[in-house]
Amino acid sequence: TVLVRLTPELARRGLKVSTLKHAHHAFDIDHPAKDSFAHRSAGATEVLVASGRRWALIHELRDEAEPSLAELLLHLSPVDLVIVEGFKAYAHPKVEIHRVANGKPFLFPEVPNITAVATDGPVPATELPILHLDDIAAIADHVLRTAVERDTLVRELQALPIPERIRQSAR
């Protein structure tokens, strides 16, 4: 995906990046034969699995409402930039990723806050910047420019200024 190629490009530029992806379906990151799965099945609200290489916190919503984007962002450690996949209804800046082969219509202008379109085909008339799906450097440039121009949702939530290295990378 574009996000899988964008993340190392931003990291190469010296940024610490996190990603947040919305899943439209139920998912599991553990499996029935594992203790963590058994802990959740037994009623644990949260299960934290840790090793010397990584850790993961699994939170069961049970009867809770799905958390908002802002609530989810609060669970991330401070980083320079959070790239969000999905969450179309929220007011954060978005780059529309459009693949002709998927046969779906463009999201703009119906979806708010789209700041550019990255595609592998023709685009209806628009004033939005048009980027090629394979031009990851241009997509990274646009993301960083947008972060500097608009300030990011994470920075607003954390009331932190944009780190100088993002400002410098966006020039």
Predicted features by range, described:
Residues 128-171:
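C-terminal accessory "lid"/substrate-recognition subdomains
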Residues 42-43, 110-113, 126:
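Short, structured coil segments at secondary-structure junctions
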Residues 25, 53-54, 87-90, 100:
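Short glycine-rich anion-binding loops that position phosphate/pyrophosphate groups of nucleotides
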Residues 89-110:
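Conserved C-terminal guanine-recognition region of P-loop GTPase G domains, centered on the G4
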Residues 114-120, 124-133:
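Helix-rich interaction surfaces within compact, conserved domain-sized segments
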Residues 5-67:
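N-terminal phosphate/diphosphate-binding loop that engages ATP/GTP or pyrophosphate donors
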Residues 82-84, 94-99, 113-120:
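Short, hydrophobic beta-strand segments that form beta-sheet elements in well-ordered domains
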Residues 60-89:
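Phosphate-binding/switch loop-helix module in NTP-utilizing enzymes
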